[in-house]
Amino acid sequence: MAWIRFLRAHAAVTRQLSARLEAEHGLTLSDYDVLVQLYHAPDRILRRVDIARAVLLTASGITRLLDGLERGGWVEKRACKSDARVSYAALTTEGLKRFEAARRSHLADIEELFGSRFDADERAQLAELLGRLPLAETSEACSE
């Protein structure tokens, strides 16, 4: 029963967050997740493979996602001068502006749909409980 409730709650909240982000800012949750990673990265640039790992996407999945962000002018692709096999994604000035606008409303939506349902002690307890679940390798430093 707990598993079913967890899955349904996750699906419902994710669906609402995604719909709001797309309607207000033209971003998917996956787009937003990539922008969060870049926003928190030193100089707002990361290796594409590191972004893929952080957002739990395959190499082809991150390529498709970054291609869309590049076409929108939010992110730019940069080559590694010392290794042609390595490429980077960097947050553009326009991407930074648009991300910051999306961030404000997205965090407010998270608070409305999730945070306001629990007091501080319950959120801490929930974080501790969910922390027991196995997670894929990812950086905790860039999560919002």
Language-model-detected regions and their locations in the chain:
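Short alpha-helical "packing" element that flanks the helix-turn-helix/winged-helix DNA-binding module
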Residues: 31-35
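Key DNA-contact positions within bacterial/archaeal DNA-binding proteins
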Residues: 60
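Charged, amphipathic alpha-helical coiled-coil/dimerization segments
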Residues: 67-125
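Alpha-helical residues within the helix-turn-helix
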Residues: 23, 53, 70-71
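N-terminal leader segment of winged-helix/HTH proteins
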Residues: 1-25, 144
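Short, locally clustered residues in the helix-turn-helix/winged-helix DNA-binding domain
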Residues: 36-41, 103, 131
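C-terminal regulatory/oligomerization modules of transcriptional regulators
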Residues: 120-144
